[in-house]
Structures are given as C-alpha cells and as structure tokens.
Amino acid sequence: MEFSEWYSDILEKAEIYDVRYPIKGCGVYLPYGFKIRRYTFEIIRNLLDESGHDEALFPMLIPEDLLAKEAEHIKGFEDEVYWVTHGGKTQLDVKLALRPTSETPIYYMMKLWVKVHTDLPIKIYQIVNTFRYETKHTRPLIRLREIMTFKEAHTAHSTKEEAENQVKEAISIYKKFFDTLGIPYLISKRPEWDKFPGAEYTMAFDTIFPDGRTMQIATVHNLGQNFSKTFEIIFETPTGDKDYAYQTCYGISDRVIASIIAIHGDEKGLILPPIVAPIQVVIVPLIFKGKEDIVMEKAKEIYEKLKGKFRVHIDDRDIRPGRKFNDWEIKGVPLRIEVGPKDIENKKITLFRRDTMEKFQVDETQLMEVVEKTLNNIMENIKNRAWEKFENFITILEDINPDEIKNILSEKRGVILVPFKEEIYNEELEEKVEATILGETEYKGNKYIAIAKTY
C-alpha cells in the first residue's frame, strides 16, 4: 500500500479525523484524534509557559485595511484569503478577512501597549484556527483550508540582539518539542525567495515522510523592524530616544499530528508516543466460561492500580479477543495487558508492546515498575527508529550534478545535501534540479544546500 493511501486509511480506521465534511479542506477531529491533539499541544504550551511566554487570544476577523497595511506581507498570500462581505443581508463597508495568520491584528494591539523600553519584551502566543483558500490538492492535517490548530507566538524586543536571542530560544523550544515526540528534523535557513513575507529571514524545521517527501513542521521568523515600522510600535529608549521594536514570530500547526501518525506508524496502524497516547495501557480480559468474574475482578484490580499514574482503559466489549487486539494495534496504544485465568493462577501478567509486537510476562508485584520502564523504553525505541529512517533518507553529494540529483529524488527521494556555494544558491538551481531548495543547513558540522521534493 502506498503511503498516501495508508495515511488516509489510518485516519479513518484509527478514528482520528473525518474528512467527509461538505467543504473541501475542512474536516472533523474525532474524540480519539482530538485527545492526541490535546496532549501534543499541552507539551508546547508547557514549554512556552516555562520560557516566559503568556497565552492570549485575538479576534478571528481582520479588517481589510489592517490586513493590507503590510504590503509585502499580504502579497505572500492575498489569493488565499477568505473574506466576510456581509452581515446578514447588509453589505459591509469594510471587508473582514478570516485570519490567515495574526501578525497584523496582534501588531496593531502591540502599538497600543508599547510606550517605553520597560514595556518590553512582550512574548505572547495563541493556539487558534486559521483559514487559507488552498487551491492546491488538500490533504487532511497537512494542507487544509481551515487549519484547526495553529500555534503562533509573537514577540517584541528593545534591541536587535534580544530578537536574535529570541530566535535561538524559539529554535531550542521546538527542538525540545520534536525530541519529546520522537520526530526527526532538519533545520535550515530558508532562501530569500522563500522566506516569510516581511521577515528579515526564516528558519524552518523539515521532517521526512515515509514516501521520501519533506514536510515543513515549524518556522521561526526574525521580523527585524519591518512590521514595527509599518504599525508604529515605537518605544522610548533608556536614553530618551525613540526606536522601533524588534520582532519575531514562530509557529506550528496540525502538521505535527500528521507527522506523529506518518513517522511512527507501520503497516498495522498507529504507533503512538506514550506521552500523547489517549490510552497508554489497554487491559484486555480473556474471558473463559465459568471464569468470567475472576478475570474481570483481576482486570479491575490492575486498572485501579495503574489509573493514578497512567491513562488506562479496560476493553470489556463483548467481542473476540483477536478483534480487540487488532483494534488497539490500529489505534497505536503503546502497551496492552492481557488478563486470563492461567495468568491469575500463576500470579503473572502478560504484556504486549505495540512498537516491537513482542509479548512478555512479569510478576504481579513488579507491574507498576515494569509498565513505567516499558513505556519509557517504547518512547526511546520509536525515537531512535525514526531518526535512523530519517538519516537513511539523506544523501550527501560532493558537487552539484542536476541529473544525478533528479535521479536520486525520483528513485529514493529524501533530502540531498550539496556543499554550500553562494554562486549556485539561487532559484535557477531549483529549476535545474526540478525540486525545492529548503535552504542553508548545517549537517554534522558542514554547511550544505538542502534540496528535496516537498509536500
């Protein structure tokens, strides 16, 4: 089965996301998928909160004149904006955009908040939905018209150096975030022609999906004073002079969820990192005639023992055990506990690891310790496995050879790294190799141009 077919299939079978909503590029997070989303974005919330960011919430509607204020910025996506033109039957005097991203409304407000250098820095974020009229082929959680989960952070500083340090902090936060999820990444500085509209420069995180295409999963932008000059975010310096704030912004989206699914999954279904699994341990009672009460009693006893520390579920559905096993393997539950009469008699408990598909037994007395240790080991294993696959997708060439690059990207895909040379680093190179230049990157101590087929 090809990756794209597998991906669509698993979203449905694992009950993550339903695409059957009657608007192209819009879908529904089902309860199981929503929980994965919630636990995933809890991680980034905590990382941002711990580093001095404050969560806020800005309106979804943006007046046309406000959106158009930063001309270079809006030029980057003006064809993708959804417009509200009527209130009821009355045509509006000023069209309202459904938020494609929030620089313009946030910076309008920052102008009102910032007066002196002591008002800085400002470090805020919001997790909201955004809208883009995607004309390309939409894909669930990858290319959407309603991006249901967009975490955008926006900062303002009194010096250029502080803004540079904020970019470094943002990169560090994202590295911790993706490391926690076991998602491998390549960090690159996007080319001038592909940077965020209105930014001084853009840093991006890309991962590689099983089909060898790269997926942009995070971006960090140094905005310099470009937006603050447009929006007049002016402050009084310690010496009494006036200056414009230095700004940064950085974001992630539902693509993180798509990456968890794509990178860790296998032909049987999901393999969820325990930290975001809605159910970390599923208990499956193996019911035998005449032993029903004993088995269910033991299953409940195990549940009570584990529920304080782990997300646990007893599957007491009246269906065959094999069907239950299959269902939980599709849903990627990291650890399964099987409870049968023989195990109870021998004071043993049977466990099954989703990542390795291995069964093993432990003494009842060791259960808590073994469950915790095994879940940690599962996380480490899937992370190492993901990085190994990622590394295998990287090809390093000693020089630019467009035909060789085209052949590799046609057969193997992945990322091709060629030594960085200023004279060849241009849009012409993209045309020659018929692929995307991700940007400048450092890999194992050397500077390269990264080239790939992208989503």
UniProtKB/Swiss-Prot annotation:
Keywords: Aminoacyl-tRNA synthetase, ATP-binding, Cytoplasm, Ligase, Nucleotide-binding, Protein biosynthesis. ATP binds at residues 132, 134, 216, 219, 253, 255. Disulfide bonds: none annotated. Pfam families: HGTP_anticodon (PF03129), ProRS-C_2 (PF09181), tRNA-synt_2b (PF00587). GO terms for cellular component: cytoplasm. It is found in: Cytoplasm. It catalyses: tRNA(Pro) + L-proline + ATP = L-prolyl-tRNA(Pro) + AMP + diphosphate. Transmembrane segments: none annotated. It comes from the Archaea. SUPFAM superfamilies: C-terminal domain of ProRS, Class II aaRS ABD-related, Class II aaRS and biotin synthetases. It is an enzyme of class 6 (ligase). Its EC number is 6.1.1.15. L-proline binds at residues 101, 103, 132, 221. Residues 329-359 are annotated as: Interaction with tRNA. One of its GO terms (biological process) is prolyl-tRNA aminoacylation. Homodimer. The dimer is functionally asymmetric: only one of the two active sites at a time is able to form prolyl-adenylate, and only one tRNA molecule binds per dimer. Consists of three domains: the N-terminal catalytic domain, the anticodon-binding domain and the C-terminal extension. Catalyzes the attachment of proline to tRNA(Pro) in a two-step reaction: proline is first activated by ATP to form Pro-AMP and then transferred to the acceptor end of tRNA(Pro). Can inadvertently accommodate and process non-cognate amino acids such as cysteine and alanine. NCBIfam families: proS_fam_I. This is Proline--tRNA ligase. It comes from Methanocaldococcus jannaschii (strain ATCC 43067 / DSM 2661 / JAL-1 / JCM 10045 / NBRC 100440) (Methanococcus jannaschii). The gene is proS.
